[in-house]
């Protein structure tokens, strides 16, 4: 055994370039497999985490209200109340395109939207200061708002100092009643996750001058029943509009499943490419071994004739 090992080492040392190229082929093949698999797993993890943070228990509804057939917020809430065994929260969504101001400072890229008192729970956010929008704020159309941490810091210096202050939204004065905790400390910037203002949706509807609300967000109590909940919503909307082109219902769990399928396909393709690289490296090693045996055929014969095993 020791003699064979010494002979192998001597053979490798005597063919340095050939040995180096052989090892290089194996190293490249193995490295390709490790790197590609690691990249895919890292990408998959980050994307899935990003989608999960958006809420896999959410169902988004977008409707097109026509003059002849429309869906008002009371109808949607009545449907929601009839199925509280399946749905967790509901929030209308009203986008308001406007500028916010405080004194001489203004912000033009801030996301301004109308939400319900349940939207904070839908997003899974927590308040750093103050309180959330309440049902009474919505019912009485109070000009109050909840702001993201970036807005509070940028216009008032801190979340604590922002509470109770006045914020001009589209020329109307709103009282800041709550500041949401930081969601993305690394991207606490203009247009980021923390750059938003939430108003009572009843007030936002008046500001947007839309007669009806076109967007809603539901959460489901059991994600395994997301498909059932989606079908239920679609049936309700079809009964209202009699035309399935006038609404679109999207379950986040479906998007996540579709994404996982695409990532699995990508992982398989990259794994196949890496496997081919390793196979090519293996063929190279076999080729070198065959060449080495061919070159030493005479030496092997002489050793055999002298009694070598």
Q: What are these regions, as identified by a protein language model?
A:
Residues 1-309:
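Bacterial inner-membrane juxtamembrane interface segments
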């Amino acid at each position: 055994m020791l003699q064979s090992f010494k002979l192998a080492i001597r053979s490798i040392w005597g063919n340095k370039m050939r040995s180096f190229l052989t090892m290089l082929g194996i190293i490249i093949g193995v490295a390709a497999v490790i790197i590609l698999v690691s990249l895919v797993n890292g990408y998959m993890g980050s994307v899935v985490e990003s989608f999960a943070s958006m809420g896999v228990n959410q169902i988004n509804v977008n409707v097109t209200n026509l003059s002849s057939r429309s869906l008002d917020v009371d109808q949607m809430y009545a449907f929601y109340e009839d199925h509280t065994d399946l749905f967790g929260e509901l929030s209308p969504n009203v986008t308001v395109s406007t500028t916010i101001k405080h004194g001489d400072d203004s912000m033009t890229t801030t996301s301004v939207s109308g939400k319900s008192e349940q939207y904070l729970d839908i997003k899974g956010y927590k308040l750093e200061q103050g309180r959330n929008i309440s049902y009474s704020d919505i019912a009485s159309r109070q000009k109050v708002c909840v702001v993201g941490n970036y807005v509070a810091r940028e216009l008032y210096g801190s979340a604590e100092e922002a509470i109770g202050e006045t914020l001009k939204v589209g020329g109307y004065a709103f009282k800041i009643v709550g500041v949401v905790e930081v969601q993305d400390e690394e991207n606490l910037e203009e247009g980021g996750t923390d750059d938003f203002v939430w108003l009572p949706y009843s007030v936002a509807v008046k500001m947007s001058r839309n007669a009806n609300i076109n967007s809603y967000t539901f959460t489901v109590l059991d994600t395994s029943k997301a498909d059932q909940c989606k079908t239920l919503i679609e049936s309700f909307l079809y009964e209202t509009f009699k035309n399935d082109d006038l609404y679109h219902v999207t379950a986040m769990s479906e998007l996540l499943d579709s994404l996982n399928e695409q990532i699995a396909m990508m992982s398989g393709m990259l794994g196949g490419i890496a496997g081919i690289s390793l196979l090519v490296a293996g063929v190279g090693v076999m080729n070198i071994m065959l060449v080495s045996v061919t070159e030493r055929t005479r030496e092997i014969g002489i050793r055999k004739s002298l009694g070598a095993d």
